[in-house]
Structures are given as C-alpha cells and as structure tokens.
Amino acid sequence: MTPNKPTLHPRNRHQGRYDFPSLIKAHPDLARFTITNPHGKPSIDFANPEAVRVFNRALLKAQYGIQHWDIPADYLCPPIPGRADYIHVAADLLADDNAGDVPRGTQVRALDVGVGANCIYPLLGHSDYRWRFLGSDIDPVALASAKAIVQANGLGKAITLRQQANRAHILSGLLQEGERFDLTLCNPPFHASRDEATRGSQRKWKNLGKQDPKRKLPVLNFGGQNNELWCEGGEIRFVTQLIGESVQYAERVLWFTSLVSKASNLPGIEAALKKSGAKAVRIIEMGQGQKQSRMVAWSFHDDAARQAWHAQRKSQA
C-alpha cells in the first residue's frame, strides 16, 4: 500500500481552492493577472513573477490582514501555504511540551534564521499566534525590505530585525546577552552551487510550462538571490553548521528547527545531531501538492526541562 502523502496542516488557512473573488475584493489589482486554467477555474500564471507577487499581496491582505507587502525584484517570492505549514507544525512541536496547547502571545519568542526580503515567517507567525520574532539575515538589502514591510504594517513591537555581520556564521555572534527563544526557524539554501540553482530554476519553469507548450523559457533564474538559493556545500552543509553552532545556545533556546528539502540529506543531519548531544530530536514530514519536505527539530532540554520552560514562561506572563 502506498502511504498517504502529507497534506496541508489542519490549521492552515489555505485549504482547498483559492477564493479568487475574495482575493480580488481585497486587492483589486489581482484581477488583471487572473486567468482561466485548462480546468475552467480561475488562477494566475505562476511563471509570471509579477503575478505571483500581486497574488501573494492579495493573500496576505485577505487572509492575514497584512495591508502592505512587497519585495525587491529578483528576490524570492514565497509560496505562502507551504510557509504557513512550517509555522503550524512548529506550533504543534511547542504544544507537545505544553499539555497539548499551542502557546500563544508575545511571551513566545521565535528566531527566523534567514528572514529574507519577504519577512514571511514572522508575518504569518505573529498573525496566527501573536508570537514575537527576531529575523536575521546576512543581506542588508533583504533586511531593508523586511524592515519596510514591518514598519508599513505597524509591527515594530512584534518583529525586530538584525544583521548577521559575519557571513561565515549562522547563529554565532548573533544573539545578545540574555536573549532566550522558544523556537528557531530556518529555510536553508537548497542548492550547493549557482549552476545547480540555475538548473533547479529551469526545472521549475519547465514544470510550469507543461500546461502551455508554447511558453518560452527565460534564461534567468526562477527568482531569488544567490544567498537565498544556494551556499557552498548546499543544504546539508548549512544545516549541519546550524546544528554545530546551536550547541553554544543550548540553554537559551527550547527548540531549534530547520526545513530539510532533500531526504537524502537526513542521514548526515541525524549523525550531526547525535554528535551534538541533543536530548530530543523530531523529524516531521510535510507536503504541499507535489512538493515534499520535512521539519527537523532538536532540543538540548529533556522532557521535564521543556515542560518547566513553558511553566516558567506562563508564570512570567
């Protein structure tokens, strides 16, 4: 028997088909990008970067109350349902140590490693759970874009941003004295080289073009800056470095997490986690449509210590 593929999380707001009339009402500019797909349903051309950007703007406004959202040209335009799923799966992880209740409110702090120009995880996490976020990045242009989004939506008290000054580090040197986080999030660079990233982008274009054999494939990549799409050594090197650096913050973070796109990277990641001395490890499968991924989570606190962490936070609320 073939196992069922993971579907969207039950709390994900993006179940079923998109409600285009509601989206267009929230953001009328979407109307000029709306087309009828081969099944006779309203859609957009997902190979058109501007259409995807306007579509995201409409989704964020209609579903999350985010009034202002934009990103610079050639920066990654995230698929929002998949990003939301990561937030919900991470919320369930916190709930497991909290008598099954998802902790909500500004007492919960999350760190988004690689917040990007789109600032998507802090926006979704704060909207759904009222968590406070710190977003880090090595790219000053991305941080400036994220800051503009935060300020335009009056979220300065909920979302703060910080540059990782040393491009060779991920966590090291980033956190300030005494900072504690319930959760870290990370969507690491997927590819190991620019050429690999370009080939991956071309595959995406070809997949999108299957419905329209007349589509001309562009020469440039699918969207995303170099540091968003690839790093030396790829996903496996980035995540294993993140694990190594997490050890120095073992007492100050309840759960570290990262997405892992390539299942073939899991054995190396699990070996790094064993070496790190993590006391709890979770690998949770996720999936949206044809895309399969998983969240890897690790903690240096045992069961009793994690429950005590939540109890302490509640007592300080």
UniProtKB/Swiss-Prot annotation:
Localization: Cytoplasm
Record's protein name: Ribosomal RNA large subunit methyltransferase F
Catalytic reaction annotation: adenosine(1618) in 23S rRNA + S-adenosyl-L-methionine = N(6)-methyladenosine(1618) in 23S rRNA + S-adenosyl-L-homocysteine + H(+)
EC number per UniProt: 2.1.1.181
InterPro entries in alphabetical order: METTL16/RlmF, rRNA_lsu_MeTfrase_F, SAM-dependent_MTases_sf
One term of GO molecular function: 23S rRNA (adenine(1618)-N(6))-methyltransferase activity
Family: Belongs to the methyltransferase superfamily. METTL16/RlmF family.
PANTHER family named among the record's database cross-references: RNA N6-ADENOSINE-METHYLTRANSFERASE METTL16 (PTHR13393:SF0), SAM-DEPENDENT METHYLTRANSFERASE (PTHR13393)
GO cellular component, one term: cytoplasm
Keyword terms of this UniProt record: Cytoplasm, Methyltransferase, rRNA processing, S-adenosyl-L-methionine, Transferase
Role description: Specifically methylates the adenine in position 1618 of 23S rRNA.
Listed NCBIfam families: PRK11727.1 (NF008725)
One Pfam family from the record: Methyltransf_10
